[in-house]
């Protein structure tokens, strides 16, 4: 049965996946939302009332009015302290809901963070331990505790979690049961049963197409692919279940910050751009510099690329495009020219983002759910940023 929407980033990340995910979840009302994120990037959603969610572990689709379950796929690299913090921040909307972690989801531990803090990191990594944890999982050492099912009884490193004795998922489950939220590590069989019984599913990807291990500028890439096919694989979502792919883009793509030591020497370059792109400065743009959600470092910013658009379209083949940061364009003609490039490469710009909240999303879909009055260019031009 076709019932799943997949959200994927068509550039270098930070295109507003969290924003469109929250918007679509409130509109489409999925009962199951799915991710297989790593704890190295934040996804932000601000609703129409101004409430803000910044998530690295929980899908932004938790705002769905019909939510029943949040699935965290086996392809995830999880930070359990981060997960706990995010649940605590949304206890009101998670009452009576289930957070189900696939038994083979990877658990980041302090040794992984320490490993990435060393000389292996020369490519502008967020240094959250995600790549190191993934490598340990791939090594498949039977004596290694690395996936969720290894920590049912104990072994979790959660310094701020107030429990007596050793901490395992059973302890966490009991703690949150008293708070009205079900959180469990589940078998593949149970995970699949919940997925297939869902009426509507929303699947949220991370990072971006041009950061993909195979499609990106190797070695200046992330540790896996960022395509709809990879997102579905990491979440155990059958391709045949997908009836819509929503690709996210921005008018001026970004890359994460370069890394510098205490003396100002560059020790980590985040990588190149496409040959038809130019790296710009925030001063040239005339907007407040953006900082990454997790590391709080200033992002690099580039001009729009037809080459990037073409390659992402050919691999991701989205049904709809969310074009974000329209407020960064200097004129309506500039915005129109970017939309024309996307259209000429086969993309359908169905949503336009003018600011940092759901109230700033304009939809071009006839009869779609939107504000009574759409945002105006002059009102939002260069007025706000999205994390």
UniProtKB/Swiss-Prot annotation:
Binding site for L-aspartate: 293-294, 299
Cofactor: Mg(2+)
Keyword ATP-binding: yes
Keyword Magnesium in record: yes
InterPro entries (alphabetical): Adenylosuccinate_synth_dom1, Adenylosuccinate_synth_dom2, Adenylosuccinate_synthetase, P-loop_NTPase, Phage_PurZ
HAMAP family per UniProt: Adenylosucc_synth (MF_00011), Phage_PURZ (MF_04166)
Pathway this chain belongs to: Purine metabolism
Enzyme class: ligase
Binding site for ATP: 14-18, 42-44, 207, 324, 327
Alphabetized SMART domains for the sequence: Adenylsucc_synt
Annotated EC: 6.3.4.25
Stated name of the protein: N6-succino-2-amino-2'-deoxyadenylate synthase
Record-stated family: Belongs to the Caudovirales PurZ family.
Residues reported to bind Mg(2+): 14, 42, 293
Assigned keywords, A-Z: ATP-binding, Ligase, Magnesium, Metal-binding, Nucleotide-binding, Purine biosynthesis
Domain of life assignment: Viruses
An MF annotation (GO) of this entry: ATP binding
NCBIfam families per the UniProt record, alphabetical: amino_Aden_PurZ
Annotated source species: Acinetobacter phage SH-Ab 15497
Active site: 14 (proton acceptor)
A GO biological process held by the record: purine nucleotide biosynthetic process
Function: Involved in the synthesis of the atypical nucleotide dZTP (2-amino-2'-deoxyadenosine-5'-triphosphate). Catalyzes the condensation of aspartate with deoxyguanylate into dSMP (N6-succino-2-amino-2'-deoxyadenylate), which undergoes defumarylation and phosphorylation respectively by host PurB and guanylate/nucleoside diphosphate kinases to give dZTP. dZTP is integrated into the viral genome instead of adenine by the viral DNA polymerase. This Z-base probably completely replaces adenosine and forms a triple bond to the opposite T-base. The resulting non-standard viral DNA is called Z-genome.
Residue sites binding dGMP per the record: 14, 40, 125-126, 140, 222
Signal peptide: none
Catalytic activity reported: dGMP + L-aspartate + ATP = (2S)-2-amino-2'-deoxyadenylo-succinate + ADP + phosphate + 2 H(+)
